[in-house]
Amino acid sequence: MVQLVTAWLAVLIAAVGIAHAETPLERGSYLVNAVMACDGCHTPRGPSGFIMDKRFSGGSQIWDTSAYTVRGSNITPDRETGIGTWSEADIKRSLTDGVRPNGTPLSPQMPFAFYKILTPRDLDAVVAYLRSFAPVRNEVPPPVYKAAMHVELVPGAVKPFTEDALNNPVKRGFYLGTIAHCMECHGRRADGVADYKTALGKGGYLFKGPWGAAVTSNITSHPKRGIGAWTDAEIKRALTQGVSRDGRALQQPMARQNYFSRMTGADLDAIVAWLRTLPPLE
């Protein structure tokens, strides 16, 4: 009798697990909306923030550098102005290799170097979610390329992660921090050059934008210059509420609490565990 009850309990527990299993669409939504923060470039903005009825139809910001002038592309399934005619392979190639179906490159403004690490399951999930958007017609001016573009690859993230690696909290944190492209800002030197070998997490780059100016913080484990003396709760508050240790509100482009507040507790724990491993730099 006891064995029978135990067997039924096992079946019920398994059934609950299946009922709550994450579908590819749910996983893709989580990655895009809680981690990768795709709205930041691909959703137009108005005076009150993102224009959600035109979500992902192309950003209103312009990035004008010595090498390129670009806007965020329309990534809705609109067949004329979006990616509605792209195959799944086309979308995956743009995400991880930075190449359009016609062979033209994407600018480094699209953080494809950080997406090379995506597991095959997660890459499939992101594509499934992108294909689920409502098509929105919005013609975005084509990019203008002025010079050769260099993309710095992220050490340890040049190929897809394995599912087994995600079971390790530190490795999982590195994975999440990579696809959240944290080092796109925090891994730049003061001159703006990405340096993931000697300046990983050091910060110090001055960003200028509609919000004003902000210097990227040191997020290494240095006890004074970095966040080595911060508690886990303080780091999580910065991520999910946009509040620094001293109570100051974090400025753009770091104020990403709208995204990171949607992360699971386990994923936040993993990111904190990974940040603790960054060598102290000053």
Task: Tell where the protein language model's regions lie, with residue ranges.
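Electrostatic cytochrome c docking/interface patches
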Residues: 17-33, 46, 150-178, 191-192, ...
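Extended intrinsically disordered, low-complexity coil regions enriched in Ser, Thr, Gly, Ala
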Residues: 85-90, 100-108, 192-195, 229-234, ...
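Sequence context surrounding c-type heme c attachment/ligation sites in exported
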Residues: 23-39, 53, 120, 170-183, ...
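The canonical Cys-X-X-Cys-His
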Residues: 28, 35-45, 91, 126, ...
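Bacterial N-terminal signal peptides
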Residues: 3-16
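Electron-transfer interface patches adjacent to heme c in soluble/periplasmic c-type cytochromes
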Residues: 56-90, 113-123, 198-238, 257-268
